[in-house]
Amino acid sequence: MAKRILDATASDFEKMDQAALLESIHLAEGRTVCAEVVAISVPLVHAVTNAEMAAAFGADLISLNGYDVLHPMVMGAPGRASLALADLPIPIPADFPLGLGASISDVKRLVGRPVGTKLDCVPPERRDEFGGRVATVDNARRAVELGADFLWLAGNPGTGASTDLIARGVAEVAKAVGDQVIIIAGKMHGAGLGRADVVSEEAIRRYAEAGADIIVVPAPGTVPGATLEYTKDLVEAIHAAGPLAMTGMGTSQEGADVETVRQIAMMSKMTGADILHIGDAGFSGMAPPENIMAFSIAIRGQRHTYRRMALSLRR
């Protein structure tokens, strides 16, 4: 029998395939924390990746945002390539923590947790703008090669990623790599298209039929109109369709005061979601660390939070 993600250690995660990880999340009964961090932001603390910081404050899953699979970079991580700048007398050495060339597997070794990346489902005419961040089959395969445990097909603000584009992207990516990696689908906001194109039961049906393992809906109290009852109905629709459900806090409220974050966490748990996500909109590409910890404590108490924070990577 699979371990609950609450009890899993770094060595446990190394042995899990996508089916085992999904079961581990399911067994935790709504007590899984996913923290999103911007891979290419200057980290909150010098020479420590935001992924490490989020993991240290209680995250079970780390989602990289802004990670380009064609030009990998995770600020704060040891690099695998040198950078030469015209206005510098010497190249910046590879061991300077710019994280040039850092793979997802490199991040996993640093944090001892499952790590995945977002791929944006942008309109075809905008694909060149986003390069290795676009949800294409080739980029998905590259992300898997780089070590991704999950791929989140969604849309960042202003990308124009519609629910239709996400559904199509999920179908293509799931067909190509769905047997190797968890597929997450869904937006936490309009992605530049307004409130009408955030989520619907029809979108949920399409995502599930396309092959999504986890479907995302906005957390209660985030996007306008996302009440507890409304979000609970969407979560029930997701479970009825088969996938796991994740509530997402992607409206910059992850950078609000601790009490607001606690309220959103508790309402999210009341919806019946399997995973509760906290976004990356702090001052430096991640939520304030104390908010991640408060978010975790709210949904599973000090015992499980401190355990996750303290567990050694050597276990």
Predicted regions, residues:
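C-terminal helical cap(s) of enzyme catalytic domains, especially alpha/beta-barrels
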Residues: 74-94, 98, 234, 270, ...
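Active-site-adjacent loop and "lid" segments of alpha/beta metabolic enzymes
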Residues: 48, 128-134, 191-201, 229, ...
